[in-house]
Swiss-Prot record:
A GO biological-process term: tRNA wobble guanine modification
Subunit details: Homodimer. Within each dimer, one monomer is responsible for RNA recognition and catalysis, while the other monomer binds to the replacement base PreQ1.
NCBIfam families, alphabetized: Q_tRNA_tgt, tgt_general
Family recorded in the similarity comment: Belongs to the queuine tRNA-ribosyltransferase family.
Pathway: tRNA modification; tRNA-queuosine biosynthesis
Protein's name according to its UniProt entry: Queuine tRNA-ribosyltransferase
Molecular function via GO: metal ion binding; tRNA-guanosine(34) queuine transglycosylase activity
Pfam families noted in UniProt: TGT (PF01702)
Underlying gene: tgt
Organism: Macrococcus caseolyticus (strain JCSC5402) (Macrococcoides caseolyticum)
Cofactor binding note: Binds 1 zinc ion per subunit.
Biological role stated in the UniProt entry: Catalyzes the base-exchange of a guanine (G) residue with the queuine precursor 7-aminomethyl-7-deazaguanine (PreQ1) at position 34 (anticodon wobble position) in tRNAs with GU(N) anticodons (tRNA-Asp, -Asn, -His and -Tyr). Catalysis occurs through a double-displacement mechanism. The nucleophile active site attacks the C1' of nucleotide 34 to detach the guanine base from the RNA, forming a covalent enzyme-RNA intermediate. The proton acceptor active site deprotonates the incoming PreQ1, allowing a nucleophilic attack on the C1' of the ribose to form the product.
């Protein structure tokens, strides 16, 4: 029995969107679901109680950062990541691969793993499939990710071909090194850049290894969104229907809706918390940058439709004042709002799937949000 299982409830008659439930050792969550990112074992400025109050069911933490500080051995001795950070719901940890390939300029890829330099102090480090599994087993997350190479985009066909072949070999080593399959589910990551045949090959390789779930990696790395959507349309049908499907690194409202339409169950991104820190807020009518001078005397909430703590209690003028004054409370309030907005959006997406009207919802949302879509009923 896998530690994590997927229960399919229904498919939207308007699209390929799925309503489902993912069951984990620390509880279940409905999908499609957005996962707030807690890079350093905390979702920045947020308490676990606040996250639960806004219906965040699962959060993501970062293997690379927790390995370097405080160390996976410290977290193991604390009783695992759940106890360490006082979060009793499901946790997903990434493998650290994306950070190795995105944060470190000095790296050397070998068959056994990657040599690179610490992004803060320059010390030499080595991360391999075996090491990534050891760290994540110490962390004790419910869902852990295979160690993969995330090729840049654009990259040549030859480079990406060699990369996915290496990722497949690394995936096999991850399965061999995984010590806790009974209470931690290991997901494989499909790569392939913008090349459909390489996405097909990567998917076939990984599906043959029978992981409990699958992610699509290497998208949302700067490519135009039409390319991302084309890769999703090609790749998602290659993934097992009875297992969770996870699109890594996606968190803009339009991409969440488009991903759900194409059959994705799980999403994560630092976007809502990162932009909150400079005063950028997502609302039903588009983004609001509260630092702008036009909000100095705007005594209305960020979003009249929003039921979050921030919108029920504070105005754009007050938020502008806090952000301009570099007050931590301002960052907390904008973070609360952005996370609530995306989690509530996913609740609306699930309800639209339940009622077989996700494309209708997309049209309504895009029009109000101010997204220019020529034919929103197409996908």
């Amino acid at each position: 029995m896998n530690a994590v299982t997927y229960e399919h409830i229904k498919t939207c008659k308007q699209s390929g969107a799925r309503l489902g439930i993912v069951h984990t050792p620390h509880g279940s969550f409905e999908t499609p679901m957005f996962m707030p990112v807690g890079t350093q074992a905390t979702v920045k400025t947020m308490s676990p109680e606040e996250l639960k109050a806004m219906n965040a069911k699962i959060i993501l933490s970062n293997t690379y950062h927790l390995w370097l500080r405080p160390g996976n051995d410290v977290i193991r001795e604390a009783g695992g990541l759940h106890k360490f950070m006082n979060w009793d719901g499901p946790i997903l940890t990434d493998s650290g691969g994306f950070q190795v390939f995105s944060l470190s300029d000095m790296r050397k890829i070998e068959e056994e793993g990657v040599h690179f330099r610490h992004h803060l102090n320059g010390s030499k480090l080595f991360l391999s499939p075996h090491k990534a599994m050891h760290i994540q087993n110490d962390l004790g997350s419910d869902i852990m990710m295979a160690f993969d190479e995330c090729p840049p985009m654009p990259a040549t066909y030859e480079y990406v071909k060699a990369s996915i072949e290496r990722t497949s070999r690394w995936a096999e080593r991850c399965l061999e090194a995984h010590q806790r399959p009974e209470d931690q589910a290991l997901f494989g990551i499909i790569q392939g850049g913008e090349y459909e045949d390489l996405r097909t090959q990567s998917a076939k390789d990984l599906v043959s290894m029978d992981f409990p779930g699958y992610a699509i990696g290497g998208l949302s790395v700067g490519e135009p969104k039409p390319i991302m959507y084309r890769m999703l349309e090609h790749t998602t049908p290659l993934m097992p229907f009875n297992k969770p499907r996870y699109l890594m690194g996606v968190g803009s409202p339009d991409a969440l809706i488009e991903g759900a339409i194409r059959g994705i169950d799980m999403f994560d991104c630092v976007l809502p918390t990162r932009i909150a820190r400079n005063g950028t807020c997502m609302t039903s009518k588009g983004r609001v940058v509260v630092k702008n001078a036009k909000y100095e005397r705007d005594f209305t909430p960020l979003d009249e439709k929003c039921e979050c703590y921030t919108c029920k209690n504070y105005t754009k003028a007050y938020l502008r004042h806090l952000i301009k004054a570099d007050e931590t409370f301002g960052i907390r309030l904008t973070t609360i709002h952005n996370l609530h907005f995306l989690l509530n959006l996913m609740e609306q997406v699930r309800e639209a799937i339940r009622n077989d009207r996700l494309l209708d919802f997309k049209e309504e949302f895009f029009e109000e949000y101010g997204l220019n879509v020529e034919n929103p009923k197409n996908f």
